[in-house]
Amino acid sequence: MKINQLRVEDVCDFIGGSQPPKSEFINTPEEGYVRLIQTRDYKTDEFPTYIQEKSTKKFCDSQDIMIGRYGPPIFQIFRGLTGAYNVALLKAKPKSCIDREYLYYFLKQDAVFQYVDKLSARTGGQTGVDLVSLNKYPIRLPEDILDQQRLVSVLSALDAKIDCNNRVSGELEAIAKMLYDYWFVQFDFPGTDGKPYKSSGGKMIFNSTLKREIPEGWMNGTLDDIGKIVGGSTPNTEDPDNFTANGTPWITPYDLSRNQGSKFITRGLQDVSEKGLKDASLKKVPVGTVLLSSRAPIGYMAIARTEMTTNQGFKSFIPIKSYSTAFIYYTVKGALKTITHYASGSTFKEVSATVLKTVKVALPDPRVVDQFSVSVASVFERQDLLELENQQLTQVRDWLLPMLMNGKVTVA
């Protein structure tokens, strides 16, 4: 296999996006409009933006390699969306000498990220990719395109399995969410006769506090009635003894941003030591606790897979006797718009425990909650296993990636 020693500028071009005025943005698609892809869109599909197609000449398709230009975190590598793209994204356009998949995996290497992150300038509190430095980065490139494709085929196969697992988990999530809505939003949970309660004429009572009808026997309450709400804190980061490699998982909102697409979380980037727990008066939350980021940003959620703790950017819900993890998860998720609306703060928006205790919810008959929890238990268990398998596949892929790129591992 003949290898060429080149630089990034020899194998691809970087094309910046455009930024039409926000006054032209709309939130629902119309004829003549195209989606404006932003960094956030690769993490959530909840806030799409559309612009007139004629207002830009910068477009990408689902196969294009897109790079997050600003941070933190800087230099995120994306693909999978079609539309126009804004100035916060770069498109890496491969030249004829390199296979697109090979370029994609090359740019995803941690070594490349560390190089870019170290040399990219920080201005106005925001880091931007230094393209001059990136273009000088060396790349070891097999001359034959077929050799390039052979090398990355292993990585593509691992990613295909991860994507398959994600699709299955997404389908399971749709089933569980549909059941929750059917029972607790439409009130068609199984009645005593086994028939859908409201549709079969189950008695509904107007609740003056909630200002709507709820099933007879249900009550009004607030979010703190379905789980014990606890916060977190941060140990002194200047004392290295407060952190350790294998201590208690300590979760930050950034960890949840990296965990988007997953329902459960095991740990973040850092663990705290026993000293850190004590010095910051950190409280451990048990398995099954529902984590909610309460600032920077608000609304990221995950379920604790192990005993853990969090920083001050969280309000976590520890399940109490009558309400399960599954019920809390979907109830809080359904209240996110209200929660965000009540957020306050001059520097950045934040939701306090006091605010959460004012968010009104309907409190079902505990027997209905128990029945729901049993019904979705297998879904949650299957999703958990799929996510754990994906973690293992990701570890294998991330180990193989630099080995394949530097020639320490070859593919026959």
Model-based region annotation:
Residues 5-26, 31-65, 85, 204-210, ...:
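Sequence-specific dsDNA recognition surfaces
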Residues 38-39, 50, 55-110, 252-254, ...:
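A short beta-sheet element
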Residues 101-133, 324-362, 412:
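Short, positively charged
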Residues 83-90, 101, 123-152, 294, ...:
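A short glycine-rich beta-alpha junction/loop motif
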Residues 1-19, 140-152, 156-182, 200-234, ...:
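Non-catalytic DNA-recognition/assembly elements of restriction-modification systems
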Residues 261, 287, 324-325, 329, ...:
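Hydrophobic/basic alpha-helical segments
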